[in-house]
Curated annotation (Swiss-Prot):
Gene3D superfamilies: Acid-sensing ion channels like domains, YojJ-like
Entry GO MF terms: ligand-gated sodium channel activity
Bilayer topology: Multi-pass membrane protein
Name of the protein this chain belongs to: Sodium channel protein Nach
GO terms for cellular component: plasma membrane
InterPro entries per the UniProt record, alphabetical: ENaC (IPR001873), ENaC_CS (IPR020903)
TM helices/strands, residue ranges: 50-70, 453-473
Gene responsible for this protein: Nach
Organism: Drosophila ananassae
GO biological process: liquid clearance, open tracheal system
Family: Belongs to the amiloride-sensitive sodium channel (TC 1.A.6) family.
One of the Pfam families matching this protein, by short name: ASC
Positions glycosylated per UniProt: 128, 165, 220, 348
Topological domains annotated Cytoplasmic: 1-49, 474-516
Length: 516
């Protein structure tokens, strides 16, 4: 490429401005020497204007295609920047806590305790202990909408509270099960242990239950580590300590087993299984952990489409996991529609009123709104970036009393007992890494591939464009201005018009320029 140090008069077009002339000259130089495919043919002197136009059109179409593909790459990068990779299928399970185990009696209250406590209370006029016991099923109105409860029933239970100066929570404390009334014998990690050392009374969506290794406000987190295999799991003999328990009348003969993350509130979101009495049940657990790479942690919430536990605050629950957010929405709707929330959601984090029997009709009537069946009552609950999932497989067998076993754990079992074994079925577990689908290097590589495929551009081509339309453009502009100045300084020939020109009222100068 050669650039003239001085332009001849024939190379200067006085019909356009110096800037336009220098731009045109720079464009011609760029097309003649550019590495971009097709541009040189748009200024080929050996072809006509039709060929020039065709090549210009082809180059323009190819450039548009490159831009469209590059935009597609960028949109994909922004809309779905992450992916899941299996980091390991054999991570040692002893790096995890043992999965939280919650055991809930399938009947809300210990009837033997309830009868004894009601004998100490002043009962409403015209009623007796048997009537009150039959009305205890009204507590299901705090949880479900299966039944409509009459105003007479709710008023009767309200009067029971007021006559004895009791709150609903105090009444529940005297009626509920204790853990030693459900759990007869426990074994963990191969050793028989006191059940009350392992299990603590917890609040759940199903009322009061007994939980092991659960992190909940008011509980001491035992932080027991996991070990693979049946021998090192948790075994429990289940036996109701309630002489008044009638499985026919209660329509139940067993307990609920709930397994979820240690920070999650036990609820319908948990992995729930029914453990029947007069059987031996084996619950084999396979954990799966999802965690994030440092690159994903550095992304914004909008880009990774998930949150960490300290990034999303809730009113009624301390620790953020997705099930807790759904329940937080449920409690919020309770307060919104009924101005109270149920007793098992009381963690002393707010001053909201606790629902009593008089609020049950409101809770039942607004059940669809409370559990967010309608879009208008749904809440925003982002997914958690890091979490543990538990796949629970159940195997159950009839309980054999006369089977010769040398294990002291089985001594003294009764025919109506239930035996539960919860264990991790492998010494290793799967870890999934939430990683970047592509980083900035990959994005730049994809963009470069698009432009290279269609127009043959590279980063060097970008530098070339910048060079031509800065350095070379300035040089051409200076040459253009100098050439025009020299043409004017050579003194063009001109003539004055005659003084008696009748076609003009004012004297005008008419320049007649002759080419030199």
């Amino acid at each position: 490429m050669g650039h003239e140090e001085e332009l001849s008069p024939e190379q200067v077009d006085l019909k356009v401005s110096p800037l336009m002339g220098s731009l045109k000259r720079t464009w011609n130089d760029f097309c003649a020497t550019s590495s971009i495919h097709g541009l040189r043919y748009t200024r080929d002197e050996d072809t006509n204007r039709i060929v020039h136009f065709v090549w210009l059109l082809i180059s323009l179409v190819m450039f548009i295609c490159a831009v469209v593909m590059a935009r597609t790459f960028y949109i994909d990068f922004r809309s779905n920047p992450t992916r899941m990779n299996v980091e390991s299928d054999n991570t040692p399970v002893n790096t995890l806590y043992f999965p939280p185990v919650t055991i809930c009696p399938d009947v809300l209250f210990n009837m033997q305790k309830s009868e004894a406590f009601l004998q100490t209370l002043q009962l409403p006029q015209g009623t007796n202990q048997s009537v009150i016991l039959r009305k205890l099923h009204i507590f299901y109105g705090f949880m479900l909408d299966d039944e409509k409860y009459s105003e007479q029933d709710t008023s009767l239970m309200e009067s029971l509270l007021s006559l004895n100066n009791l709150t609903l929570q105090q009444l529940v404390e005297h009626l509920r099960w204790n853990c030693d009334e459900i759990l007869y014998r426990c074994r963990f990690n191969g050793q028989i242990r006191d059940c009350l050392e392992l299990f603590q009374l917890s609040k759940t969506f199903f009322g009061h239950c007994c939980s092991f290794n659960l992190r909940q406000t008011g509980l001491n987190f035992t932080a027991e580590r996991a070990v693979g295999g049946l021998k090192y799991g948790l075994s429990v003999i289940l036996r109701y300590k309630d002489d008044s328990y009638d499985p026919v009348q209660s329509y139940s003969f067993g307990v609920k087993l709930l397994i979820q993350e240690s920070d999650a509130f036990p609820s319908a979101h948990s992995s729930s299984k029914f453990i029947a009495f007069n059987s031996e049940v084996f619950a084999a657990i396979r954990p799966q952990e999802t965690f994030c790479s440092p690159a994903v942690k550095a992304l914004s919430i909008e880009d990774r489409n998930c949150v960490f536990r300290n990034e999303f605050k809730m009113r009624y629950f301390k620790n953020y996991v997705y099930p807790n957010c759904e329940l937080n929405c449920r409690v919020t709707n309770m307060v919104k529609f009924c101005n109270c929330h149920t007793y098992f959601f009381d963690f002393n984090r707010t001053t909201d009123r606790i629902c009593t029997f008089k609020d049950i009709p409101c809770l039942v009537d607004n059940f669809a709104n409370i559990i967010s069946r309608k879009r208008s009552t749904q809440c925003y609950c982002p997914l958690t970036c890091e979490h543990l999932d538990y796949d629970v497989q159940i195997s159950d067998f009839p309980l054999k009393l006369n089977m010769p076993v040398g294990d002291q754990f089985y001594s003294g079992i009764n025919k109506n007992d239930g035996i539960l074994h919860v264990f991790i079925n492998s010494f290793g577990y799967r870890r999934l890494r939430h990683d970047l689908l592509s980083n900035m290097v990959t994005l730049v590589s994809n963009l470069g591939s698009a432009f290279s495929l269609f127009v043959g551009m590279s980063m060097l081509s970008v530098v070339e464009i910048m060079y031509y339309f800065s350095v070379i453009l300035r040089k051409n502009y200076v040459l253009e201005c100098e050439a025009r100045k020299k043409m004017l300084h050579k003194g063009p020939k001109f003539a004055w018009p005659k003084a008696n020109d009748s076609h003009s009222k004012h004297q005008k100068s008419v320049f007649i320029i002759h080419k030199m």
